[in-house]
Structures are given as structure tokens and as C-alpha cells.
Amino acid sequence: GHGGVALQNAAMKGDASRCSANLPVPLRRNSKHSKTCDFSFSGLKTAVLYAIRQHDEDVFFKNSAMVCDFAASFQDVAVQHLVDRTRKAIELCKRENLEMSSLVVSGGVAANTLLRERLSELEDVNLVFPPLSLCTDNGVMIAWAAHEARRTSSSPPPLFTEDEITSLEISPRSPFGIYDGED
């Protein structure tokens, strides 16, 4: 698996309210970006680093309850940031009279259960989540997006069936070509 899966698994075993770290929701207060749709996790990553350094790292990482509580707190804050920014983007579309019929939430982050739950609470937007099996590999996500675009258009039929797309072997380390040994 990847980091997102490990984070979610740990967070599901933890309780954010038990975490001693007070992690900030990025770009929320007193920032020139607080009213934009920008995403930034740099401040959150720095806060995580400092919070972990407040503990003896050997003790911290051997205490699974502490790690799980910390993971739950981090996930909660990261998801809140994503939801805040998504809400701002939806508000901007409405304010600018931009037509938006649906919002597709895709990529690896779309596999996060908490993010799916929290985004589903947003009103006035039709959310589309690809099947979880397609939320791990960007290449497959691109294929799925193309399939959906063709499926919903009045022009040519899909190039691939959903079964053909979902039967693709997914590997996070697939090579792009032959390495020639030169940089």
C-alpha cells in the first residue's frame, strides 16, 4: 500500500481528541491565502515534525496508541483543509456564475473514507467518486475519466468496457521504459 492507506488504517484505530498535538488547519487564519482555493500542506507538515520532536521518537513510534491518535488528528486536519478549499471553489463557481453540474473527486486521495464522508456533507454539488479500486493509480484514473467522458457523450461508444478497465493490473512501480544507465 501507500502512505495514504497506512495513515487511514492508523487513524481508524485512533482518536484525534486524545492527540496532544494541536495541529493547525492550513491557510485558515490570518493568511493572504485564507480566502483562496489554494491548497498547502507545508505548514501542517512542519507542525507534525515539531509535534513529533516534542516526544522521544523511540518511545513515540513504539506506542501504537499514540501513533494512531496522532494519525487520526493529522487525517482530520488534512481532510478539513481539503473540504474547506473545495467549499471555497464551489462558492467561487457560484459567485462567478460558472456552470458546474458535478465534481469528480479522484486520484489516491479519493480513496480516503473520511474525505468521502466529509465531502458528501457539502450541499449544492453532485459529487462523483470513482470506484475505490480506481483511486490508486493515476494512469487508471485517466483511463476511467476518458471512459466516463465517452460513455456520457452522444458521440462514439467507449473504447473500453468498465470490466476491461478494472481488470488492468495496477502497480505503483511500473517502469516507463528501459533504463539505459545514463543520467
Where are these regions (language model features)?
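Acidic, glycine-enriched active-site microenvironments
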Residues: 1-183
